[in-house]
């Protein structure tokens, strides 16, 4: 989405001049791997949740275990819509007891995407707020195909990367002020994202980038942990340790051996994800976890079916959300049993698993 010259840009040139600096190669590469997510927009929840995780487990989540509500917020300060969808447990929860995940989608996504995670989290007692970023969302795929490169270029601007962080902040402000906000334990708020959304998650969790010699810190102190799925590097910013070493919250990193972003002249593969894992929090004594699936693809972690292998795709999705929930229970409830058991339960799928504790 291009800037409106009649609107003031809250990110002036001194901080975010409009060049494709951090994300251009990564975003355009993601487009080569991803198409708009196929996610159903209709939810038909009914009461009666259980916190027990069935095993073996179907990918589809019982609709009686969660509710879903869409919001169409508008940030008047930035003159920017902030759509979102909130998944909640169907079972009644006491005030101040629910953890909350705030999820950021990849390029071309929407609030309806990554529903396999949102529904599952809610069915297991965790709220999940999926935020839509209007400057890099599914609108990219609409319009004249000949102008798609221009729309992608707009999505790759530094100002859009910064807007995405502000989208998460604004959505978090709004949901905590809403009636549902009373349900959440504000000490247990976790940021999560896939691909471009993982970059957004790193920024709101404490990653520090430089722009024209000025260091930008976009850390939101309400974030207590982060889940990074298929995280690309900060393109053109050099050593990731300079950006990520100061992150001071626990992190979960999920990728696959074939999690590769590739276009002519640019390749980002597993080693980039490993470099991000190694750099994250390297100056801090904070826990971090890495899971690398065998094979797969970059888009296997979206709602798309079949990518990365028709049989492998649902198995990786199920294992991903089980690990994410185990991470949340470990970090937020100090219950590490499920996380410790996870690599054994999914040994046939996992190429590498690391759990680093201070």
Language-model segments: which ranges?
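Active-site-adjacent alpha-helix of alpha/beta-hydrolase-fold enzymes
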Residues: 245-318
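Primarily recognizes the serine-hydrolase "nucleophile elbow" in alpha/beta-hydrolase
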Residues: 171-246
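Short substrate-entry loop that stabilizes the transition state in hydrolases
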Residues: 93-96, 103-140, 235-236, 261-264
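Bacterial N-terminal signal peptides
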Residues: 24-33
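Alpha/beta-hydrolase active-site loop
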Residues: 151-182
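Cap/lid segment of the alpha/beta-hydrolase catalytic domain
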Residues: 134-163, 302-305
